[in-house]
């Protein structure tokens, strides 16, 4: 916990480096001088922290040495006690082992603290090296102040830098808001385009469906038209046949009426005409049959007469 706290404190005490790109030499000089002041303050704080920790480590080391001496004396007394009383040897050995473990643990702590001390010494040397490197920035800032007519004090440079930083922050915030607005408009445009694309797709599907239905209706209409034409053709054929039958029936009726000995009145109904024709044909058939029978009878009589 002490090491983590020290590291955090060191991180907080380190100077914050600003980006010096695209700024004037006077601003860079001011920034470098500010960094130099912060480095010096951080180094001084680390020196004080290092001295304080070194003193704490020394006190701990002395305390551990005293504890080690006390432990050795306790071991000596414990050995004498074992020689005087064997019945308590088991318990004494356990206590001795515990004390040995504690001594070993303390020795490990001493080693760890020694390593921390060495690390702090190395950190001190590194900070001194950084401080020595940063001194050139201090000299540079001083040289800039010597040649700059506009800024005579470091505070003026700091104020100018703060103004430029605030302006830069405002411009970045404005740019961010414009980017957010553009992204919002772009998103809304994408949503609108998607909605209209979906609507167009649905309308195209409906048009395709209606077109398919129209083609079906047209095909059905063509079928019905073909049926109608066929029906009209059949009706015309039948009408023609009916007219031919009526004319034939009327012609035959007139011929039968002219040859019949019965005075049939004139008929225009084809059915009545067919009845008359049927009767006439039936009578004619009977007459022909009777005539043939009489001829056969006569022929038979003639044959008999010749034989006799």
UniProtKB/Swiss-Prot annotation:
Principal location listed in the UniProt entry: cytoplasm
One Pfam family cited in the UniProt record for this chain: DUF4200
Phenotype of gene-disrupted mutants: The mia2 mutants do not express the protein in the axoneme and display slightly jerky, slow swimming phenotypes, reduced flagellar beat frequencies and defective phototaxis.
GO biological process, one term: inner dynein arm assembly
Coiled coil segments of this chain: 103-134, 164-227
Example of a GO MF term: dynein complex binding
UniProt KW Coiled coil keyword: yes
GO CC annotations on file: axonemal doublet microtubule; motile cilium
Organism superkingdom: Eukaryota
Localization of this protein: Cytoplasm, Cytoskeleton, Flagellum axoneme
PANTHER family in the record: COILED-COIL DOMAIN-CONTAINING PROTEIN 42 LIKE-2-LIKE (PTHR21683:SF2), COILED-COIL DOMAIN-CONTAINING PROTEIN 42 LIKE-2-LIKE-RELATED (PTHR21683)
Function, in words: As part of MIA, a complex associated with the outer doublet microtubules of the axoneme, may play a role in ciliary/flagellar motility by regulating the assembly and the activity of inner dynein arm.
Subunit text: Interacts with FAP100; form the modifier of inner arm (MIA) complex.
Protein known as: Cilia- and flagella-associated protein 73
Origin species: Chlamydomonas reinhardtii
């Amino acid at each position: 916990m002490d090491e983590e706290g020290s590291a955090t404190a060191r991180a907080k005490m380190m100077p914050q480096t600003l980006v010096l790109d695209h700024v004037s030499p006077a601003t860079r000089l001011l920034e470098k001088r500010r960094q130099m002041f912060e480095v010096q303050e951080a180094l001084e704080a680390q020196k004080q922290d290092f001295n304080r920790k070194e003193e704490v480590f020394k006190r701990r080391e002395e305390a551990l040495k005293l504890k080690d001496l006390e432990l050795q004396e306790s071991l000596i007394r414990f050995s004498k006690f074992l020689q005087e009383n064997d019945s308590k040897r088991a318990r004494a050995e356990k206590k001795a082992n515990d004390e040995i473990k504690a001594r070993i643990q303390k020795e490990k702590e001493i080693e760890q603290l020694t390593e921390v001390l060495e690390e702090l010494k190395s950190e001190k040397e590194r900070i001194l090296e950084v401080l020595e490197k940063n001194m050139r920035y201090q000299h540079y800032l001083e040289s800039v102040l010597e040649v700059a007519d506009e800024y005579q004090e470091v505070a003026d440079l700091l104020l100018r830098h703060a103004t430029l930083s605030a302006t830069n922050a405002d411009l970045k915030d404005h740019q961010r808001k414009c980017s957010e607005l553009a992204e919002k408009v772009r998103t809304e445009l994408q949503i609108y385009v998607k909605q209209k694309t979906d609507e167009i797709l649905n309308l195209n599907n409906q048009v395709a469906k209606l077109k398919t239905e129209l083609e079906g209706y047209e095909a059905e209409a063509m079928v019905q038209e073909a049926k109608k034409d066929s029906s009209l053709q059949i009706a015309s054929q039948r009408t023609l046949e009916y007219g031919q039958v009526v004319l034939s029936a009327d012609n035959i009726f007139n011929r039968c009426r002219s040859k019949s000995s019965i005075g049939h009145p004139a008929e225009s109904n084809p059915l009545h005409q067919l009845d008359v024709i049927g009767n006439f044909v039936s009578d004619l058939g009977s007459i022909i049959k009777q005539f043939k029978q009489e001829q056969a009878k006569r022929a038979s009589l003639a044959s008999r007469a010749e034989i006799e």
